[in-house]
Amino acid sequence: MNLRDYIRDIPDFPKEGIVYFDITPLLAEPKAFQYTIDQLAERFADYKIDKIAAAEARGFIFGAPLATKLDIGFVPIRKPGKLPYETISVSYDLEYGTDNLSMHVDAVAKDENVLLIDDVLATGGTAEGMVKLVEKAGGKVSGMGFIAELTFLDGKSKLSGIDTTSLIQL
């Protein structure tokens, strides 16, 4: 199955000059969505993974069902102020400023192996922030999985030393 067939290009969104890669057609097709989860599970089958963590919101779409398929826990990573319990946070650099990510203080235990999942690897800012957050909690990043990678933005360069995989390269 060619997953690229289920990614819609939206020119000039969210602003002029940007092409947005819309995953909603993939979500609308159950066989394509299941294939996506199965492919991620297959790629990480031999990894030592205790938990999967994913950033809101689209990372949740893929991370939670993958965690269920692998029979491991899921950790939601959110913007500050969105989680009800005590949190730890990190700030990370974006192309035009900084942002923050948070998770519950007890979400990742010391030395737990965590697989990070997100929908798209673009500039690498969010991915780098997720790595910092897991490491701040004392966890180890086992790898990172993405549905698509925008190779022309070279986000992988911010993740040196971390095994990353993408199902689609754009």
Swiss-Prot record:
Family label: Belongs to the purine/pyrimidine phosphoribosyltransferase family.
Example GO molecular function: AMP binding
Q: What does this protein do?
A: Catalyzes a salvage reaction resulting in the formation of AMP, that is energically less costly than de novo synthesis.
Q: Which UniProt keywords apply?
A: Cytoplasm, Glycosyltransferase, Purine salvage, Transferase
| Oligomer and partners | Homodimer.
Note the Gene3D superfamilies from the entry: 3.40.50.2020
Main subcellular location of this protein, as a coarse class: cytoplasm
Q: Name one Pfam family in it.
A: Pribosyltran
Q: Which GO terms describe its biological process?
A: adenine salvage; AMP salvage; purine ribonucleoside salvage
The record's catalysed reaction(s) read: AMP + diphosphate = 5-phospho-alpha-D-ribose 1-diphosphate + adenine
List the EC numbers from the record. Answer: 2.4.2.7
Instruction: Specify the pathway.
Output: Purine metabolism; AMP biosynthesis via salvage pathway; AMP from adenine: step 1/1
- EC main class here is transferase
User: Can you say what this protein is called?
Assistant: Adenine phosphoribosyltransferase
Q: Where in the cell is it found?
A: Cytoplasm
Among the entry's GO cellular component annotations, what is one?
cytoplasm
Question: Which InterPro entries does the protein's record reference?
Answer: Ade_phspho_trans (IPR005764), PRibTrfase_dom (IPR000836), PRTase-like (IPR029057), UPRTase/APRTase (IPR050054)
Q: Which HAMAP family match?
A: Aden_phosphoribosyltr (MF_00004)
Report the domain of life of the source organism. Answer: Bacteria
- Coiled-coil-forming residues are none
